[in-house]
Amino acid sequence: MTGTKIDGKVISQSVKDRVKKAVEELKNQGINPCLATVLVGDNPASATYVRNKHRACEEVGITTKDHKLDASTTQAQLNEIIENLNNDNSVHGILVQLPLPEQLDEFTTTSRISPLKDVDGLTPHNAGLLAMKKAALVACTPSGVMEMFDYHGIELEGKNIVLINRSNLVGKPLYHLLLDKNATVITCHSRTKNLVELCQSADIIITAVGDRNKFTLTSDMIKEGAIVIDVAISRFQEKLVGDADYEDIIQKASFATPVPGGVGPMTVAMLLKNTITAASLSSQIGK
């Protein structure tokens, strides 16, 4: 029996609809939600991602400020721009597009962003709050995955979940979010020795390897009725693919996300939601 496709385009639109209403409410209070983006260099993929984020903001009524910097920008120069945005009361969210040129340090850069404007959820402050169940701004992809579970009414309590990623952007924040839902989470990575066996016993598999030459999730690696969330995206044999062979696993899984059209749209939608949250926080602090 074929499983159910978790359609990120449909779910992300439902998030955008809610955000659009929230934007209207904030504007009625005299607050104009604004996202500032910072792009360093001329990486074509990064430029495309930023354009997509600006387009999504326009759809829901969020104002954007675009800062394009030369690839030779120094750390001191980038720090100064971030500090200026931190002090700009008209800006509610700050997003520095990653990756950065090699002369710039990602940790130093993200640490400079005000936690109240950290719409990517990457500052050490917000990462710590997440571990303590107190974060208002959470990394967009992990929160997008959680939104997918909520949309389909998928219960996480007591579930055995294999999470194949340990990055600061996906694996670590998602681990905390799943743990908060009383799931049993096993984090796997490139040094995990019994990955296939762990996957075969999992109720839910969330995979974000991003290299089909190294890893492909197939139906023989999952149990009947498992749920598969594919966070990865890469180009393989001239196609955009995830980690999972979707057409194969959907014959065995109860739910699965396609690539493209799965988790990807959710990441942008949750960025919009975080921007609204940040704007709301700023209005509360200003009272």
Swiss-Prot record:
Residues where NADP(+) binds: 165-167, 190, 233
GO molecular function: methenyltetrahydrofolate cyclohydrolase activity; methylenetetrahydrofolate dehydrogenase (NADP+) activity
Pfam families cross-referenced by the UniProt entry: THF_DHG_CYH (PF00763), THF_DHG_CYH_C (PF02882)
Keywords: Amino-acid biosynthesis, Histidine biosynthesis, Hydrolase, Methionine biosynthesis, Multifunctional enzyme, NADP, One-carbon metabolism, Oxidoreductase, Purine biosynthesis
Domain of life: Archaea
Any one GO CC term of the record: cytosol
Pathway membership: One-carbon metabolism; tetrahydrofolate interconversion
This enzyme's EC code(s): 1.5.1.5, 3.5.4.9
Keyword Hydrolase: yes
InterPro entries per the UniProt record, alphabetical: Aminoacid_DH-like_N_sf, NAD(P)-bd_dom_sf, THF_DH/CycHdrlase, THF_DH/CycHdrlase_cat_dom, THF_DH/CycHdrlase_CS, THF_DH/CycHdrlase_NAD-bd_dom
Catalytic activity, as annotated: (6R)-5,10-methylene-5,6,7,8-tetrahydrofolate + NADP(+) = (6R)-5,10-methenyltetrahydrofolate + NADPH; (6R)-5,10-methenyltetrahydrofolate + H2O = (6R)-10-formyltetrahydrofolate + H(+)
SUPFAM superfamilies referenced in this protein's UniProt entry, alphabetically: Aminoacid dehydrogenase-like, N-terminal domain, NAD(P)-binding Rossmann-fold domains
GO-annotated biological processes: L-histidine biosynthetic process; methionine biosynthetic process; purine nucleotide biosynthetic process; tetrahydrofolate interconversion
Subunit organization: Homodimer.
Function according to Swiss-Prot or TrEMBL: Catalyzes the oxidation of 5,10-methylenetetrahydrofolate to 5,10-methenyltetrahydrofolate and then the hydrolysis of 5,10-methenyltetrahydrofolate to 10-formyltetrahydrofolate.
Family from the record: Belongs to the tetrahydrofolate dehydrogenase/cyclohydrolase family.
Protein name as it appears in the record: Bifunctional protein FolD
Organism annotation: Nitrosopumilus maritimus (strain SCM1)
Lineage, opening ranks: Archaea, Nitrososphaerota, Nitrososphaeria, Nitrosopumilales, Nitrosopumilaceae
